[in-house]
From Swiss-Prot:
<keyword id="KW-0689">Ribosomal protein</keyword>
<dbReference type="InterPro" id="IPR001854">
    <property type="entry name" value="Ribosomal_uL29"/>
</dbReference>
<keyword id="KW-0687">Ribonucleoprotein</keyword>
<comment type="similarity">
    <text>Belongs to the universal ribosomal protein uL29 family.</text>
</comment>
<dbReference type="InterPro" id="IPR050063">
    <property type="entry name" value="Ribosomal_protein_uL29"/>
</dbReference>
<dbReference type="GO" id="GO:0006412">
    <property type="term" value="P:translation"/>
</dbReference>
<dbReference type="InterPro" id="IPR036049">
    <property type="entry name" value="Ribosomal_uL29_sf"/>
</dbReference>
<protein>
    <recommendedName>
        <fullName>Large ribosomal subunit protein uL29</fullName>
    </recommendedName>
</protein>
<dbReference type="Pfam" id="PF00831">
    <property type="entry name" value="Ribosomal_L29"/>
</dbReference>
<dbReference type="GO" id="GO:0003735">
    <property type="term" value="F:structural constituent of ribosome"/>
</dbReference>
<dbReference type="GO" id="GO:0022625">
    <property type="term" value="C:cytosolic large ribosomal subunit"/>
</dbReference>
Amino acid sequence: MMKASELRAKQVEELKSTLMDLHREAFSLRMQKATGQLSHFHRIRAVRRDIARVNMVLAEKGGKV
């Protein structure tokens, strides 16, 4: 889990890169869940919340989401 204070220290480009990585991870977790291979269901919720945090910080910095 990332803290908002850690995210605020990053540049907009780094945040966008982090956001893309999180979206990829969320997709992968959804596919694992659909195929029955997912063992850590809590990761889905944690990744969704991390995506929300990154989007919030991007909005604060004025970077388009």
